[in-house]
Amino acid sequence: MGAGLGADSALGLPGENLQGVHGAVAWIEHMKLAKADMGAVKHAVIVGGGNTAIDAVREVKGLGVPSVTMLYRGTREGMSGYQHEWDAALQEGVSASWQSLPVAFEGTGRVQRVQCVKLDASKKPIAGTEFTLQADLVLLAIGQSKLGDMLASLGGITVNKGVIQVNAHGFTGRAKWYAGGDCTNGGKEVVNAAAEGKAAARAIDAAIMKGAARA
């Protein structure tokens, strides 16, 4: 099994249903299909600090948006995204607002502004530090939902915190069922999924050959 993860996670903030506010993964997929209309976008805000956020920042900047800001609740040193990718993004002209949190999206029909607040070291809002960012486009790169309920319904496998529990060979504990990728590791890189798929394939091949030898 390589079920991956579910839809982009949401923040549940006021104005999140405005046009122009999207999940980053869904937007990137849409953009790759050449369906993203960026003609009217002058200011973009990407919420998050992982590799998806950096991918989104660079894609948006590469499409010619003049002002692109990454809004992250932590510090640069604490972000999970690769530092070399962020260094490249800086060279391309993006900016960041560290230790910052969106509290509302505003606009008439379409997003125009993001209301934000600064955070202290414990990630608690600091009174009196509210600020506003202009935004024609907001992308939420705060993770993806896990398919725990669906996976658990399969029966015969163990699901913990939304991901399938497997051994080093991808075996789920249910006869002939192997899994790998985001549905087992919670969301890593393509290279991780490929490596886990190969490990499972080798284990499956070994099991088949062992059965053939017995026959």
What are these regions (language model features)?
Residues 57-104, 211-215:
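Rossmann-like dinucleotide-binding cores of NAD(P)H-dependent redox enzymes
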Residues 16-31, 35-38, 80-107, 113-116:
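N-terminal glycine-rich dinucleotide-binding loop that anchors FAD/FMN and/or NAD(P) in oxidoreductases
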Residues 6, 52, 76:
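Conserved Rossmann-like nucleotide-cofactor binding loop
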